[in-house]
Amino acid sequence: MGARGRLGERRAVTEDGNVMFAEGVHKSFGRLEVLKGISLTVKNGERVCIIGASGSGKSTFLRCINHLEKIDSGRIEVNGHLIGYREEKGRIVEDTENNIAKQRSEIGMVFQRFNLFPHMTALENVIEAPVRVRKVSKAVAVKEGEALLARVGLADKRDVYPGKLSGGQQQRVAIARALAMKPALMLFDEPTSALDPEVIGEVLDVMKALAFEMGTTMIVVTHEMGFAREAADRVVMMDDGRIIEEGPPSHFFDSPREERTKQFLSKIL
């Protein structure tokens, strides 16, 4: 089924508990096929960690979920809405930029690099999107932004510019910024890979709090196996553009079925 192909059943979180639904997702860059028919469902409040070797397609799949990369075929929905496309006369066609921006507002994303605005303070970074996109009043945005900075342990850094923050602090501001849009789904693309080892723990602690205290629906691409074992409801193994195994952490790490999964885990555990 192509991105412009036949229509499937519309899925909404209120009907079946699914926040994210992907079916048969393919993506190529030139002649290189990076995603080879990815299908994955994530339920409301579920935490899914995606692991696998570099080049297996993990980050590309994450970027396809919020249409930072256009899929070649398949279907991706968040909260029952097609991402990047719309239904028109019985066909699926690419949506307008305005509608895509609205769809993305339901999806928070934290990147490897923090991507903070260097000319804005921590608080200004957090409140920018709610004010401009959600049209929240500045007074309300500031109150909510201060609460989010406090939640990630940075209440005292509200007026500090990114250049004066450590890498771990910048990533925590990035998490607060993503949460400020009140997304239905949070995507984390190897959020600790650019950090110095001594500050990785502070970012992982914030992510665990999101999982256990806030019940945030999360998809996390990570090489942090300890986090995946402790915080995930389900671990997914990708290899060569395909999902080859998935399951609860206890089964996945202690009794993997696939030989490729066993090989991968033996090298990193």
Can you describe what each PLM-predicted range is?
Residues G2, E246, S250-L269:
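C-terminal boundary and immediately downstream tail of ABC-type ATPase nucleotide-binding domains
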Residues M1-H26:
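ABC-family P-loop ATPase nucleotide-binding domain
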